[in-house]
Amino acid sequence: MKNLYIYAIVLVLCTSCLGYKEMPVEYDYSYKGNFKKYKTFDIMKPSGTADSSMMNATIERSILSRMKFLGYRQTENKPHLLVSFKMFEDSMKFNGYNQPEIEQWVQEGKEDVNYDPKKLDLSSGTLLIQLYDRKQNRSIWQGYSTDLYGAIDFNDKRTLRNAVISILDKYRFWAEGFIENGGQQQSELSN
């Protein structure tokens, strides 16, 4: 049964790559993140006056699909992770960090690592996706498209899906317990 599950994942990965063009992305993370302990998520909605740069059905569906693929269950009731996104039409200056690859840092378990800030000049058409730890009330991961191949066309659904997939490909953590349960989402999750 476990082999069948592995073959199914490989098949899904192969078919999902059809029509997919990886975009150059960068990501940063918090050394306070509990990346192996998250099970649930929800997408943040802008409060008050609607911010059109934070609302896009194609981006939301792509995020939902990717997070569910990684085994996360969407819930409005005290999710472990809150996911937000923002589309930047204009160029901007952005603060990032020079960090080891996230998998390397998690594997080594170093807690006394210092942040090494870097300034980025991003041109127009940048997509930013952030993951917040609800309990810690802090951003624990952010991924953003870079402008090596030009700006993202926010009116092109295929380009938007590719941008989301490219960004969230850098977040490589399965939901806690997902793999151990053979890829089955737990019916009862503790918050």
Language-model features: locations:
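A short, structured loop/turn motif at beta-sheet edges
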Residues: 35-39, 74-79, 131-139
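C-terminal/domain-edge helix-coil "capping" segments
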Residues: 18-32, 118-126, 133-141, 146-191
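Positively charged n-region of N-terminal signal peptides that target proteins for export
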Residues: 1-4, 56
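Surface-exposed short loop/turn segments
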Residues: 85-140, 146
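N-terminal segment of the mature soluble domain
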Residues: 40-95
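C-terminal motif of bacterial Sec signal peptides marking the signal peptidase cleavage site
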Residues: 13-16
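Extracytoplasmic
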Residues: 38, 78-82, 122-127, 155
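Post-signal peptide N-terminal segment of mature Sec-exported envelope proteins
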Residues: 26-46
